[in-house]
């Protein structure tokens, strides 16, 4: 992965806000601490609204995708700006220090982890359960402390590349359209579940989701209609 210079990242964000200020912002894998800090500076300076932070720290394979300096920059710079943070189970463990995947009561562990992560951000915390083997239920901890379990069945599909990225992007789209956080999360989860269930099979290895599954079924492209 070739890192982009932080000055260029910040300039690109400014160029977007100068032209068409976005109604929502999704932040995914940034990679390096300097770039993460540049994103945080630009979003804070611009007063960005509806910021969804997907802390892409640990891949499905278990490999670390960001170094410790980048994680610190994420926690100190981006999480305080987030309206929604969307860690998967491994990322929730890393951010909270709570063991989830080996816990006897996974749901209770997710709730403890969400509470700790909530101390790092003023926004909602969505602990994604898609990497669990039993089901794919997610925990949404809202900013007011309310906890909501969003139930989901595990979809047996080896082509699951980009599920977390798609989910966080769909949440941002819902917020941009004026949906509340819980409604945006529920609609985004339904969209991703449908994209997995569609069973698109492209190329070799873990392929992408079928982002156009609603269109193929004769419906609207939007997940929020």
What are these regions (language model features)?
Residues 93-94, 157-181:
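Short, small-residue alpha-helix embedded
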Residues 1-65:
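Conserved N-terminal subdomain of the carbohydrate kinase-like
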Residues 34-44, 123, 143-147, 182-183:
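Nucleotide and nucleotide-moiety/phosphate-recognizing core
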Residues 1-9, 61-74, 100, 132-142, ...:
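Active-site-adjacent loop and "lid" segments of alpha/beta metabolic enzymes
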Residues 68-147, 156:
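Conserved phosphate/ATP/ADP-binding segment of small-molecule kinases
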Residues 109-118, 148, 180-195:
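Short, well-structured alpha-helical segments that form the helix of a local strand-helix-strand
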């Amino acid at each position: 992965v070739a890192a982009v210079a932080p000055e260029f990242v910040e300039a690109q964000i400014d160029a977007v806000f100068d032209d068409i200020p976005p109604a929502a912002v999704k932040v995914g894998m940034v990679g390096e601490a300097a770039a993460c800090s540049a994103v945080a500076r630009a979003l804070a300076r611009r007063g960005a609204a509806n910021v969804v932070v997907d802390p892409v720290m640990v891949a499905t394979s278990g490999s670390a995708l960001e170094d410790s300096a980048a994680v610190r920059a994420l926690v100190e710079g981006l999480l305080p700006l987030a309206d929604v943070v969307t860690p998967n189970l491994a990322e929730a463990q890393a951010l909270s220090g709570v063991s989830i995947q080996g816990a006897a009561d996974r749901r209770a562990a997710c709730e403890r982890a969400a509470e700790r992560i909530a101390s790092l951000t003023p926004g909602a915390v969505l602990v994604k359960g898609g990497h669990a083997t039993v089901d794919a239920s997610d925990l949404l901890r809202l900013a007011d402390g309310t906890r909501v379990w969003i139930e989901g069945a595990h979809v047996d599909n080896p082509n699951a590349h980009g599920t977390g990225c798609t989910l966080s992007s769909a949440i941002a789209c819902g917020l941009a359209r004026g949906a509340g956080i819980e409604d945006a999360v529920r609609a985004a989860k339904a969209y991703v579940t449908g994209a997995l269930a569609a069973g698109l099979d492209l190329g070799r290895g873990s392929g992408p989701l079928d982002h156009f599954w609603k269109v193929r079924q004769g419906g609207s492209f939007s997940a929020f209609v």
